[in-house]
Amino acid sequence: MKQAIGFIDSGVGGLTVVREVLKQLPHEQVYYLGDTARCPYGPRDKEEVAKFTWEMTNFLVDRGIKMLVIACNTATAAALYDIREKLDIPVIGVIQPGSRAALKATKNNKIGVLGTIGTVESMAYPTALKGLNRRVEVDSLACPKFVSVVESGEYKSAIAKKVVAESLLPLKSTKIDTVILGCTHYPLLKPIIENFMGDGVSVINSGEETASEVSALLDYHNLLDATDEEIEHRFFTTGSTQIFKDIAKDWLNMPDMIVEHIKLGK
């Protein structure tokens, strides 16, 4: 029987990481939990985010996952190291992979980070980036409206273009040549963000680098699945199954996917 890779996020954003993982590892089975009922996590305090992250983690661990991907930057900043220390399966977040990808891309060591309020206030990206390259200069910008635009399914709309333009205006006057999408919801806005920032700026989706690290970690622990056993992906949400499904089936190209509603916490 296949063991799944578990993915957790505050909503649908982590599906951007799932998509990259399934591109690289098509034989793997995915269990995904999006806590859309309590989304967004960005404005919440660290202790509350850590509590929610543990609730999601325990739900998937109880279902026998072989690895956990915290596919949410805010949750990674709040709880990655505690969860990694206490679980006996491999655990990975999205901040270190995103930082490594940005440092590969930048030519002038000036990097912008777009994130939730929680991620920006945590200083997780500047810490990770400067830990890898002390010369790097980091401009962080909280974009709290982006998550609601994505969760409402408006990420291709004129509203999205307006919100992106208004939110990113402060970055246009900087000399950054690379921008990290420091929230897994943001890659759904990547075409609009790229268009606004212009050709001279590389826009980094940490999902690709995270997928590569998932593959390497599974290989290291001898957990890669190359069998042709039937794959049964499972998707769980604490919010509306229909809204989740509408976004997920489009993003993952899974028209027949089934989404299960669950409750977490009290």
Swiss-Prot record:
Active site residues according to the UniProt entry: C72, C183
Origin superkingdom: Bacteria
Residues annotated to bind substrate: D9, S10, Y41, G42, N73, T74, T184, H185
Keywords recorded for this protein, A-Z: Cell shape, Cell wall biogenesis/degradation, Isomerase, Peptidoglycan synthesis
Gene3D superfamilies noted in UniProt: 3.40.50.1860
EC number per UniProt: 5.1.1.3
Pathway: Cell wall biogenesis; peptidoglycan biosynthesis
GO molecular function: glutamate racemase activity
One of the GO biological process terms: peptidoglycan biosynthetic process
Reactions catalysed according to its record: L-glutamate = D-glutamate
Signal sequence annotation: none
Family: Belongs to the aspartate/glutamate racemases family.
PANTHER family: GLUTAMATE RACEMASE
Stated role: Provides the (R)-glutamate required for cell wall biosynthesis.
Protein's recorded name: Glutamate racemase
Organism of derivation: Listeria welshimeri serovar 6b (strain ATCC 35897 / DSM 20650 / CCUG 15529 / CIP 8149 / NCTC 11857 / SLCC 5334 / V8)
Gene: murI
